[in-house]
Amino acid sequence: MDNKINHSSRAVAAAVGLLKIFNVPAVVLQVCEEALGYAKRLSKNHTNQKLWQIDVSETMFDSKIGKYRGGLELMAALGYESASATSRFLTLRGSVGASKSGLSKSVLTSVRRSIMELTQHTNGL
């Protein structure tokens, strides 16, 4: 379990670092805040299956997160991953096979830890 925690922390830190390298500070803050919004909505409404998947071609997502270098990496650090290089959807890790009653405790714990980590980075911007 500790290895998962360390990996998650490193992934968030690496994604924020990538954002900082390739974008101006205002963009970094915007992307982090938007990503936090997605993760917090998921954490609060984990039974809402619509939140388990993000359409990266959606204009709102693309304009606020997807078009910036490091944005998709940040979403991956928060638990969303692409099924393939050509997929237009990011799917929450661990959501496949989840029941309508919600995500597993381990998936929720991972998302919440990532939220805390990203919040710390965002507060430091």
How would you describe each model-predicted region?
Residues 1-125:
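Ubiquitin-system adaptor modules
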